[in-house]
Amino acid sequence: MLLAERVPAQGRVLVLGAGGGLELKAFAEAQPGWQLLGVDPAAPMLALAEQTLGPLMSHVQLLEGYIDDAPDLRFDAASCLLTLHFLDAGQRLHTLRELHRRLQPGAPLVVAHHSVPQDPAGKRRWLQRYAAFGEASGVARADAQRAIEAIAERLPLLAPEQEVALLQEAGFDDVELFYAGFSFKGWVAYAK
């Protein structure tokens, strides 16, 4: 929906962190005229994406690699879901700049990933809330606790205000929060 506000019926959309293809499938089904490029560093995930997409592959090109491997085309939009939280601030800024470089002026970028306050108490509180939500959804308490410990130790999480600042530094404006669910946040921003 956020991309469709500005992407033409025959638009080109870059999906960074394409994973198993669920996002690509949703786009291809909702917007059959779009040409989609899915980029992901994991060949097994791209193989799964191909299976997930089935006959919709006629609208999709898959590329194994990172943003630097994506063609230097001007896309009408891009998305990057559940990916940026794996990158430290420097890598994240580089990735956002490279996404920006591949977008038409005014093109939307949708990102969503873990983002929590960086003060120790705030970070702990939001991760505990995420674990509690998991438990309420049927995840075993021990598994939920292990998950948030792994997130805290392994992911270079940034605060929401840092995320907005990086988007702006990379050349995006009109940054808007469109989703907040415990530790997950989503923003839409537009290439200048």
Predicted segment positions?
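Class I SAM-dependent methyltransferase SAM/SAH-binding core
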Residues: 12-14, 20-69
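A short glycine-rich, Lys/Arg-flanked "PGG" loop and its adjoining helix->strand segment in the class I
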Residues: 93-105
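Conserved beta-strand signature within the Rossmann-like core of class I S-adenosyl-L-methionine
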Residues: 106-114
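Core SAM-dependent methyltransferase catalytic element
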Residues: 170-192
